[in-house]
A protein has these predicted regions:
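Long, hydrophobic N-terminal alpha-helical segment
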Residues: 1-51
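Conserved active-site and cofactor/substrate-binding residues in soluble primary-metabolism enzymes
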Residues: 4, 8-12, 21, 53-57, ...
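Alpha-helical scaffold segments in soluble metabolic enzymes
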Residues: 12-19, 57, 61-65, 99-103, ...
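Structural motif
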Residues: 24-27, 45-47, 69-80, 111, ...
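Intrinsically disordered, low-complexity coil segments
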Residues: 39-44, 70-74, 85-92
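Short, low-complexity, polar/charged sequence segments that are solvent-exposed and flexible
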Residues: 46-48, 66-67, 149-151
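Long, charge-dense
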Residues: 50-73
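Glycine-rich, aromatic-bearing surface loops/beta-hairpins
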Residues: 81-151
Length: 151
C-alpha cells in the first residue's frame, strides 16, 4: 500500500506512468477501441485492460500523478474528432469531452482539448507508449495524453 495513490490504479499502470518519458503518449481508450490490435504496435507492446472503470475515472486518478506537456505541445490532451457523417447528422459534442475538460482543469486550468481525425488517432495510438482500454461506453470516449516533465 502507498499513500495518496488512487486504489483503482493497479501496479502495472503505475509502472507504465513512471516509465514513460517526456513526449511519450498514453491512450485512455473506450470499450469500442481496437485496443488489442493497436496495443501490439505500441512501445509497451500489450494492452492494459481496466474494464471496470470508465475513462473519466482513470483520468481523474492519474491527473495529479501524470504531468502533461503543456510547455511544448499545443494540445497535450486530445480526443478523437467526430466523423464527417456524425457531424452531418448533427451529433452534438460528446458528453465525455466535457467530463475530461472538467477533470483536466483541476490541474491545468487553461487546458484546451485538441481533436484528431479518427484514422489519424489510430495511427498516433500505434506510436503511443501504451494503450489502457477501459469500460467506457460513451461515444467518442478515447483520449490521448502527452507526458510532460516533472519540475
Amino acid at each position: 500500500m502507498l499513500n495518496n495513490i488512487p486504489k483503482i490504479l493497479p501496479g502495472e499502470v503505475l509502472k507504465v506512468l513512471c516509465d514513460m518519458g517526456h513526449g511519450d503518449v498514453l491512450i485512455l481508450a473506450d470499450a469500442n477501441f481496437p485496443g488489442n490490435t493497436i496495443a501490439k504496435e505500441t512501445t509497451y507492446g500489450k494492452l492494459i485492460n481496466l474494464p471496470g472503470n470508465d475513462v473519466s475515472e482513470i483520468l481523474d486518478a492519474i491527473v495529479s500523478l501524470f504531468p502533461l506537456d503543456t510547455a511544448y505541445t499545443e494540445f497535450p490532451a486530445c480526443v478523437m474528432e467526430l466523423t464527417d457523417s456524425d457531424k452531418a447528422k448533427g451529433m452534438p459534442e460528446p458528453e465525455a469531452w466535457s467530463s475530461y475538460r472538467s477533470i483536466l482543469q483541476k490541474e491545468y486550468p487553461d487546458i484546451t482539448l485538441g481533436g484528431i481525425e479518427r484514422f489519424e488517432f489510430y495511427e498516433k495510438a500505434k506510436k503511443a507508449y501504451c494503450v489502457i482500454e477501459t469500460g467506457e461506453d460513451r461515444v467518442y470516449g478515447n483520449l490521448l495524453l502527452v507526458k510532460g516533465c516533472v519540475l
